[in-house]
């Protein structure tokens, strides 16, 4: 807010009547001053309230800040412009005033003045006639010449200043330095200005030369340079120069404009430290704190204003009034208004507008309306800010009829609504379904110069908020609709909103009507629309948009097609996805990394691992494509599922060399997939590296490593790893099954039994897999009593036998030559409903061979074919072995030759 200077009589505060009474003696500032510090800029009036009230304040006398700084040796030139700029909003339009008052000169026609006039020449611009000037020229004459040049020519002023230096005219000459600092400030030659100020340090009474610093600070405030102005102020304090009112006023005005609270607090504290009273500084500090909602700090400043016996001026009253209104403390705000008028100030439209806005903020519109009607009774007429505040207030109160009434009155009086009013109205019209009103409001928006893109954003926001986005096509009529069809930005905003809310038909309709031409932008827009559908799960809509795109433009776009492949994959339409990929491939479009990732995942989800591998081979041929961490993990999983151990090993070392960042998921994936492809030392090193970097292996990783170490008979590592897994709390049934199997294969029955007990102790039931391991271990070691005991325990438990159990029994009984037991197991297997599988048949053929039942063994092969179970190499190998065991060499040779011919 501007800075006004009024002489205010101060009287004590009457607490019963809630009025502030002040006497002429500032020492009578009341102790019971009932004001809590509140701060704010005058937002209540939407920033236009100050300018709208100038007609009320035309007759108020404004004292320049320069009168407070009459110590200034240069006619307070550095101070007056600051005060004028700060008070212009309240004192009326001063645009006709020249910027630099100090440039106006009037020489009396005495002998000295005539002598000065003879020293100037005019060669396009005023300069000094150095041939006529004498080194003995008086200091007063030199300063007069410099002053004249400063107002006319910066270059010539600097030139003459250098002449004065050469002729010893600058020692102790603060006036000359101040004048040249004005020039340097305008030219922003700050380094030279700093050098000159440092020169002044050695002069006598330099500590009193505040005008030197005021000059450069003023130049900074004119340019809005907060950082540099603060630098000069800090330097001023470091050199021991005491600031004056003008210094503080300029700085606080600059800090208020830029909402720089830290520097404002610094300047304000030093103002009080030096005992300077600058009324506008208090207002600025209150304004900054209020704007930043630091209300407690604002209260402290108001208390300081009382302690410092500040004579309140209009701006002080207004910022306090606004501070209370911003907080909704309207009783205190009204008491401020009463006291302000009692102090001799005329009714002020700014004050009333502030109160109206304050009541609107707390939804007390009856009180706001009462103030509005009171304006005429006190000789004030509502201005545009009054109407605007009423519109906003009724809008907050959700009263469309009243807001609409004041909006119409605003227009009837010849005022224009601001963007806030229009935003309020369009929101109410969207909520209450006034389509015709919305169309008129949109016309008003365009009438006041609002940009179409901004209007569209407001409309979409308003109708989205009330869930009526489907109404938007009905209110976008005429020129607005034409603009949307012609303007790419507005067009894209609207179709994106339509797609977001499932209005794909409206989107397609608008796409058919577009009038702009930009193929690159259009492709990008289609891609965004399709991606938006994908993210919101509207996959069918994405297909519609894609089909529309292909109808109007058959050119294949890599990004759009890749996204559609991904969408078809999610929909499970793998044939459509593959068709798009093949189109890309045949068109010669080269896939990028993302495209390859999408196609690979498509084939993986479709179960076509071989096709996925072929795509990866094509990708490897393109040396410029470097997979990211996600694609690397996909490749690892694919090669693992395809059991491509060589590729896994090669890929592992490729990942190591790629320089990508390994996270926890990458370590787990590499260990899980490459466990059987890597040397044991490399695998162990990767695991130790993972632990060293603070990553936690998951359960699968621990189980895979337990299996690898167990098969390698590294039981010490198995125990260490198992304990580590328990420490991390990731041990599961599979972990126990794995170590039980490892001990079983190594015939370590003691540790195997101990693992079974620990499994039960940890709350796990003995699993079917564990029972199968025990049966296999004891059976192969021909401990048949143990075998039968385990079998009985398993049948009593909840774990019923599976194919693997029956196959173990057939194998063990067959190895013993117990054909009757084998027959019983086969019968039980068939009665269980499971029936023999490939492994069962292979085991039976082996058992029949041992038992001398060759014909039955050959019959099993025929039975397999009859049940559509395709014999494998193990089947035929077991059959040939059975025939040889039973001296059927000729038949064995026939089967061997047949296997060779079939490539088995």
From Swiss-Prot:
Compartments (UniProt record): Plastid, Chloroplast
Keywords attached to this entry: Chloroplast, Plastid, Repeat, Transit peptide
Family annotation (InterPro entries): Pentatricopeptide_rpt (IPR002885), TPR-like_helical_dom_sf (IPR011990)
GO cellular component terms, semicolon-separated: chloroplast stroma
Segments for region (Disordered): 75-94
Family matches, as Pfam families: PPR (PF01535), PPR_2 (PF13041), PPR_3 (PF13812)
Molecular function in Gene Ontology: DNA binding; mRNA binding
Transit peptide, from-to: 1-61
PPR repeats: 173-203, 209-243, 244-274, 278-312, 313-347, 348-382, 383-417, 418-452, 487-521, 522-553, 557-591, 592-622, 628-662, 663-697, 698-732, 733-766, 767-801, 802-836, 837-871, 872-904
Family: Belongs to the PPR family. P subfamily.
Listed PANTHER family: OS03G0856100 PROTEIN (PTHR47447), OS12G0638900 PROTEIN (PTHR47447:SF17)
Protein name: Pentatricopeptide repeat-containing protein At4g30825, chloroplastic
Organism: Arabidopsis thaliana
Phylogenetic placement of the source organism: Eukaryota, Viridiplantae, Streptophyta, Embryophyta, Tracheophyta
């Amino acid at each position: 807010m501007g800075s006004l200077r009024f002489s205010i009589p101060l009287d004590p505060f009457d607490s019963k009547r809630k009025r502030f009474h002040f006497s002429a003696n500032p020492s009578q500032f009341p102790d019971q001053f009932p004001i809590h510090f509140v701060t704010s800029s005058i937002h209540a009036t939407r920033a236009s309230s100050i300018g709208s009230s100038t007609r009320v304040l035309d007759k108020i006398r404004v004292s320049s800040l320069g009168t407070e700084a009459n110590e200034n040796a240069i006619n307070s030139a550095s101070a007056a412009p600051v005060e004028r700029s700060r008070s212009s909003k309240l004192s009326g339009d001063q645009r006709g005033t020249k910027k630099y008052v100090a440039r106006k000169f009037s020489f009396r026609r005495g002998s000295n003045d005539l002598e000065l006039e003879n020293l100037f020449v005019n060669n396009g611009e005023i300069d000094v006639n150095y041939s006529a000037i004498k080194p003995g020229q008086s200091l007063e004459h030199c300063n007069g010449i410099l002053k004249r040049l400063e107002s006319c020519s910066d270059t010539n002023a600097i030139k003459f200043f250098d002449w004065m230096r050469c002729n010893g005219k600058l020692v102790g000459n603060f006036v000359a330095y101040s004048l040249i600092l004005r020039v340097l400030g305008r030219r922003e030659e700050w380094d030279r200005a700093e050098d000159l100020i440092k020169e002044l340090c050695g002069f006598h009474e330099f500590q009193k030369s505040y005008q030197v610093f005021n000059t450069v600070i003023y130049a900074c405030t004119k340019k809005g340079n907060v950082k540099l102005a603060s630098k000069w102020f800090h330097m001023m304090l470091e050199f021991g120069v005491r600031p004056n009112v003008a210094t503080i006023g300029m700085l606080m005005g600059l800090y208020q404009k830029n909402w720089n609270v830290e520097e404002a607090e610094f300047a304000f504290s030093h103002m009080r430290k030096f005992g300077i009273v600058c009324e506008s500084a208090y207002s600025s500090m209150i304004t900054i704190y209020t704007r930043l909602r630091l209300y407690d700090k604002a209260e402290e400043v108001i208390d300081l204003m009382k302690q410092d016996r500040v004579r309140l001026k209009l701006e002080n009253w207004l910022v306090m009034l606004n501070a209370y209104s911003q907080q909704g403390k309207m009783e205190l705000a009204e008491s401020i208004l009463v006291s302000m008028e009692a102090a001799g100030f005329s009714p002020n439209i700014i004050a009333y507008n502030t109160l109206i806005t304050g009541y609107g903020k707390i939804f007390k519109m009856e009180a706001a309306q009462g103030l509005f009607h009171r304006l005429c009774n006190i000789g004030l007429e509502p201005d545009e800010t009054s109407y605007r505040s009423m519109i906003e207030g009724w809008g907050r109160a959700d009263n469309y009829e009243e807001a609409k009434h004041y909006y119409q009155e605003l227009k009837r009086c010849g005022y224009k609504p601001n963007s806030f009013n229009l935003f309020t109205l369009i929101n109410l019209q969207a909520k209450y379904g006034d389509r015709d009103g919305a169309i008129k409001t949109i016309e008003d928006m365009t009438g006041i110069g609002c940009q179409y893109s901004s209007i569209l954003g407001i409309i979409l926001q308003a109708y989205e908020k009330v869930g009526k986005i489907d109404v938007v096509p009905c209110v976008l009529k005429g020129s607005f609709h034409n603009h949307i069809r012609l303007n790419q930005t507005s067009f894209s905003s609207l179709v994106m909103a339509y797609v977001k809310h499932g209005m794909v038909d409206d989107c397609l309709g608008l796409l058919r009507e577009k009038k702009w031409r930009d193929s690159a932008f259009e492709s990008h827009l289609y891609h965004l629309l399709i991606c938006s559908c994908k993210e919101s799960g509207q996959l069918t809509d994405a297909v519609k948009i894609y089909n529309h795109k292909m109808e109007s433009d058959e050119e294949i776009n890599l990004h759009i097609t890749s996204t559609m492949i991904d969408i078809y994959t999610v929909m499970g339409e793998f044939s459509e996805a593959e068709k798009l990929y093949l189109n890309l491939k045949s068109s010669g479009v080269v896939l990028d990394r993302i495209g390859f990732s999408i196609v690979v995942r498509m084939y993986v989800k479709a179960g076509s691992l071989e096709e996925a591998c072929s795509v990866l081979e094509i990708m490897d041929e393109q040396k410029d494509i470097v997979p990211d961490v996600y694609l690397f993990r996909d490749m690892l999983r694919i090669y693992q599922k395809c059991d491509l151990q060589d590729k896994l090993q090669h890929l592992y070392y490729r990942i190591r060399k790629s320089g990508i960042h390994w996270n926890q998921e990458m370590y787990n994936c590499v260990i899980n997939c490459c466990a059987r492809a890597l040397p044991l030392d490399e695998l162990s090193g990767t695991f130790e590296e993972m632990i060293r970097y603070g990553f936690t292996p998951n359960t699968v990783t621990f189980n895979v490593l337990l299996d690898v170490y167990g098969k390698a008979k590294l039981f010490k590592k198995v125990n260490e790893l198992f304990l580590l897994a328990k420490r991390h709390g990731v041990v599961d049934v599979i972990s126990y099954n794995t170590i039980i199997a490892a001990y079983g294969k190594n015939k370590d029955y003691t540790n195997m039994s101990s693992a079974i007990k620990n499994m039960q102790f940890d709350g796990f039931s003995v699993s079917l897999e564990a029972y199968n391991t025990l049966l296999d271990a004891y059976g192969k070691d021909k401990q048949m009593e143990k075998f039968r005991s385990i079998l009985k325990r398993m049948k009593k438990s909840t774990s019923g036998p599976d194919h693997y159990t029956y196959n173990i029994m057939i194998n063990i009984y067959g190895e013993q030559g117990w054909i009757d037991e084998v027959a019983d197991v086969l019968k039980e297997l068939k009665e269980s409903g499971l029936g023999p599988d490939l492994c069962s048949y292979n085991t039976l053929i082996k058992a029949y061979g041992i038992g001398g039942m060759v014909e039955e063994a050959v019959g099993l092969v025929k039975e397999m074919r009859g049940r559509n179970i395709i014999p494998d190499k193990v089947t035929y190998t077991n059959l040939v072995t059975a025939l040889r065991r039973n001296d059927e060499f000729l038949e064995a040779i026939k089967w061997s030759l047949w296997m060779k011919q079939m490539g088995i």
